[in-house]
């Protein structure tokens, strides 16, 4: 498992604990693939798990009346993050992603595509404090685009429309390490039920010897991965041998 896998699984676990169904998505092409979406997610407005005795993460701004569709990009590093050019500027890629949800008509998709290209413009995102959002007329759907910055912290960058590493880590900690025993949701069960994707992360948070949630570097160390190499990431983000345009 590499660092990108850990980042994406951490975010996926965070969404799952907030009531979202989550999957990844490959946008296919005649040769190779056009692009990859780190997470597509949907949450329904009547989701409820009262036995867990925990509120939803406020950073996600969930809705009690809307079906919430998310398109998410997870990016490491300390600089501004954006959706890949191969998604945000490609009409066919955007169309493919919307079709994957299976919730939008062809007419709705044709209306949404140019709006999505507009709201995902990096300059617009940089100047905003809110997640790019489109309401679907005549429905109770909203379509949102979340940028996830696991190597950054809200304390120093809280004005940007991102989900930060400490947002995810602190919330997951509260879910797995409640301060008071819950009547209908025990903490002792077969953790392997979380499956291969999540089990090692779950064990990190449930480790009885761990007294605090730590940070993203603590998680990297647990997975025997090197801490963030800021100098290298800066070079990549400035365009030197970057594997994906941003």
Predicted regions and their residues:
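Intrinsically disordered, low-complexity Ser/Thr/Pro/Gly-rich regulatory segments
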Residues: 1-246
């Amino acid at each position: 498992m590499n660092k990108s896998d850990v980042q994406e699984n951490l975010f996926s676990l965070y969404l799952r604990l907030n009531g979202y169904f989550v999957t990844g998505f490959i946008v296919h092409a005649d040769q190779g693939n056009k692009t990859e979406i780190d997470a597509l997610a949907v949450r329904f407005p009547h989701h409820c798990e009262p036995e867990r005795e925990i509120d939803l993460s406020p950073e996600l701004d969930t809705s009690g009346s809307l079906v919430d569709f998310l398109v998410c990009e997870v990016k490491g590093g300390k600089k501004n993050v954006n959706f890949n050019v191969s998604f945000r500027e490609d009409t066919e890629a955007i169309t493919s992603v919307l079709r994957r949800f299976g919730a939008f008509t062809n007419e709705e998709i044709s209306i949404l595509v140019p709006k999505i290209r507009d709201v995902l413009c990096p300059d617009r995102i940089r100047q905003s404090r809110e997640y790019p959002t489109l309401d679907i007329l005549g429905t109770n759907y909203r379509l949102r685009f979340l940028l996830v910055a696991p190597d950054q912290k809200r304390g120093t960058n809280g004005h940007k429309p991102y989900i930060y590493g400490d947002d995810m880590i602190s919330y997951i900690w509260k879910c797995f390490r409640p301060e008071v025993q819950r009547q209908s949701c025990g903490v002792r069960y077969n953790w392997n039920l979380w499956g291969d994707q999540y089990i090692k992360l779950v064990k990190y948070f449930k480790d009885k010897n761990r007294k605090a949630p730590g940070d993203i570097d603590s998680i990297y160390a647990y997975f025997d991965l090197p801490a963030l190499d800021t100098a290298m990431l800066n070079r990549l983000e400035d365009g030197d041998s970057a594997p994906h345009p941003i």
